[in-house]
């Protein structure tokens, strides 16, 4: 651990030789890097719920004009549940 400000090195990666491997593995913030990527990483789908949204849109389009009719009813004064002015 650093004792003073001079001991801190910013934006530097350290390399060490792994005992069980004959390859160099570099570490950045304690995470091992191999070939510029995080070691043994798997692809992660960040927006997995986006597929469900797209499927929902397709299903609503297949149901016809029923959703448009429901929207029109909500626009009639007095039929909205919150009765807030538009």
UniProtKB/Swiss-Prot annotation:
Superkingdom of origin: Eukaryota
Biased composition (Polar residues): 60-70
InterPro entries: SMP1
GO MF terms, alphabetically ordered: protein folding chaperone
Biased composition (Basic and acidic residues): 71-86
Coiled coil: none
GO biological process assignments: maintenance of seed dormancy; response to heat; seed dormancy process
Phenotype upon loss of function: Increased seed germination rate after high temperature fluctuation due to a reduced seed dormancy; fail to enter secondary dormancy after 3 days at 40 degrees Celsius.
Region entry Disordered, spans: 52-86
Keywords tagged on the record: Chaperone, Developmental protein, Stress response
Additional record remark: Boiling-stable protein.
Function: Protein chaperone involved in seed maturation and dormancy maintenance after high temperature fluctuation (e.g. secondary dormancy after 3 days at 40 degrees Celsius), probably by protecting heat labile proteins required for secondary dormancy (e.g. G6PDH, HOP3, SR45, ECP63, SCL33, RPL32B, ChlADR1, MSBP1, MBF1B, At3g01690, At1g15280, At1g15290, At2g31410, At1g11630, At1g65090, EMB2279, EMB1674 and RPL35C).
Similarity-based family: Belongs to the LEA type 3 family.
Protein name from the UniProt record: SEED MATURATION PROTEIN 1
Organism expressing this protein natively: Arabidopsis thaliana
Organism lineage: Eukaryota, Viridiplantae, Streptophyta, Embryophyta, Tracheophyta
């Amino acid at each position: 651990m650093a004792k003073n400000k001079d001991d801190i090195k910013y934006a530097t990666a350290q390399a060490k030789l792994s005992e069980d491997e004959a390859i160099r593995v570099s570490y950045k913030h304690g995470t091992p890097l191999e070939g510029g990527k995080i070691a043994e990483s798997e692809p992660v789908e960040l927006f997995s719920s986006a597929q469900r949204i797209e499927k929902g849109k397709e299903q609503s389009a297949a149901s016809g004009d029923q959703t448009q009719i429901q929207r029109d009813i909500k626009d009639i004064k007095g039929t909205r549940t919150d009765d807030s002015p538009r």
